[in-house]
Regions:
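Alpha-helical scaffolding within the catalytic cores
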Residues: 44-49, 312-319, 343-351
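Catalytic-core segments of thiol-dependent peptidases
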Residues: 88-122, 247-343
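Structural recognition of the beta-strand scaffold that forms the well-ordered cores
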Residues: 32-34, 59-63, 99-102, 245-248, ...
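Extracytoplasmic/secreted envelope proteins and their assembly/folding machinery
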Residues: 42-47, 57, 77, 81, ...
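Structured catalytic cores of large enzymes
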Residues: 69-70, 74-270, 375, 401-415
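N-terminal mature-domain "stem" immediately C-terminal to a signal peptide or N-terminal signal-anchor/transmembrane
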Residues: 25-70, 74
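C-terminal soluble interaction/assembly domains
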Residues: 322-397
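Bacterial N-terminal signal peptides
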Residues: 7-20
Length: 417
């Protein structure tokens, strides 16, 4: 997983002070449900969820788009974004809708815009140069030679040019794009700062909040998985989530006097995993187990798992967990929501859902580490009990128009007050 130079100067805010950013307790009538008429079971699951949660029938929008796990940018704009935008403008003039729920059967990923003919020609030329450079580097005896270093430097430059021509940084999760459906002309390259993110200090971002929707998805390998998630989430709310909280850091937590406020990338997130564990422990809600070894939790080491956050096993789920009904967790790695349907895939989101988790999140493509929800923030909001799953995600997730997907009942409150 890649790291950039961006770092977060977190503002540690009490939950009550954030009511201006995002109203407490998302309500059923504030959710717009999207179902895909081209996907078997999608409409049926949408109606099942809406009936169980008491969402008005008028809040269902039935669309027709591919049921594959990715779609072309043009199809997304024409078949998803445009009709949703039209609905919101014509039938939600009072702006009651705060959340979009994407149902089983929608693509996970929106491809970048296609290349022009001249861009294709240039990409083909660069591809040939890339192949020639790879062959040349392979012929050189020593990677330490000046000639090899120069070839490798040129190869890196060619790769970046190809990536730019293919507009690879304009691909995104469908869910992250649809959050900005009311912002018709936003920049596609890279990410857009999330104005709900509680870690940003910039007050001028508040003006964008009325143009942004929070988004969740009810999806999984099968229809039965989705129904289980719905049913378990609602049942768990009646008694509260029980079990243990597991946190899998890579390094021991440094002493407080060594804490670096400008900690970046991996170090920042590893420290945040430790802080999340401490928050859960102080709450007294669940017993906490922290692993700070280089080795991840191993098979069978995590019985009664209710909460989880850890890293790093790329696209290779470790069967360490016995998931409790209503459990919530995520694994910080680059590929963990690239598919929910490929049978042999071992990506974490798919496998956790298959094994019994009720809510998770992950990227559909390389996100960079700082695109993940900040662990200590996400779990603090979730533990509070006033915030729903979707709100906890929105408040702790730094970017929209990027790679992340939240899977779970948006109204779920595992520690409901």
């Amino acid at each position: 997983m890649k790291v950039t130079g961006l770092f977060f100067m977190l503002v540690f805010l009490v939950v009550g002070s954030l009511t201006a950013s995002l109203s407490l307790a998302l309500e059923p009538h504030e959710i717009l449900v999207l179902a895909n008429r081209n996907a078997a079971k999608s409409v049926g699951l949408a109606k099942y969820y809406m009936e169980r949660r008491g969402i008005p029938e008028r809040n269902l929008v039935q669309l027709w788009v591919t049921d594959k796990e990715w779609c072309e940018r043009e199809d997304y704009e024409k078949r998803v974004a445009a009709p949703v935008r039209e609905y919101l403008k014509e039938k939600d003039s009072n702006r009651e809708i705060r959340c979009i729920l994407v149902l089983y059967g929608f693509p996970l990923k929106v491809a970048p815009p296609g290349m022009t003919e001249s861009e294709k020609e240039e990409a083909n030329r660069l591809q040939k140069r890339q192949d020639a450079l790879k062959a040349r580097i392979g012929q050189l005896k020593s990677g330490d030679s000046q000639e090899a270093k120069e070839a490798e430097a040129e190869l890196e430059g060619v790769r970046k040019q190809i990536s730019s021509l293919k507009k690879e940084d304009q691909a995104a999760s469908l869910d992250s794009e649809i959050s900005l459906v009311l912002m018709e002309n936003f920049r596609l390259s890279g990410w857009i700062p999330n104005p709900f993110f509680a870690g940003y200090k910039a007050k001028d971002m508040a003006r964008d909040r009325d143009k942004v929707l929070i988004v969740s998805r009810l999806d999984g390998p099968t229809e039965a998985t989705v129904k289980r998630v719905i049913d378990e989430s609602m049942e768990t709310e009646k008694t509260g989530l029980t079990g243990k909280a597991y946190f899998d850091a890579r390094w021991p937590r440094p002493s407080e006097e060594k804490n670096n406020k400008k900690d970046v990338g991996y170090g920042f997130y590893d420290r945040s995993i430790h802080r999340a564990a401490e928050l859960v422990k102080k709450s007294g809600r669940l017993p906490v187990v922290v692993n700070d070894r280089q080795e991840l939790f191993q098979p069978g080491e995590c019985p009664d798992a209710a909460l989880y956050c850890g890293w790093y096993s790329l696209a290779k789920y470790v069967d360490a967990f016995q998931w409790r009904p209503g459990s919530v967790g995520y694994h910080i790695a680059s590929s963990e929501c690239q598919t929910l349907k490929q049978k042999e895939s071992q990506v974490w989101c798919k496998r956790m859902l298959e094994e019994g988790i009720a809510a998770t999140m992950g990227p559909v493509g390389e996100p960079y580490v700082q695109a993940f929800p900040v662990p200590e923030m996400f779990f603090e909001f979730l533990l509070d009990g006033s915030w729903t799953l979707a709100e906890s995600y929105a408040l702790s997730q730094p970017f929209w128009s990027w790679q992340m997907v939240l899977i779970g009942d948006p109204l779920y409150r595992p520690f409901k007050r």
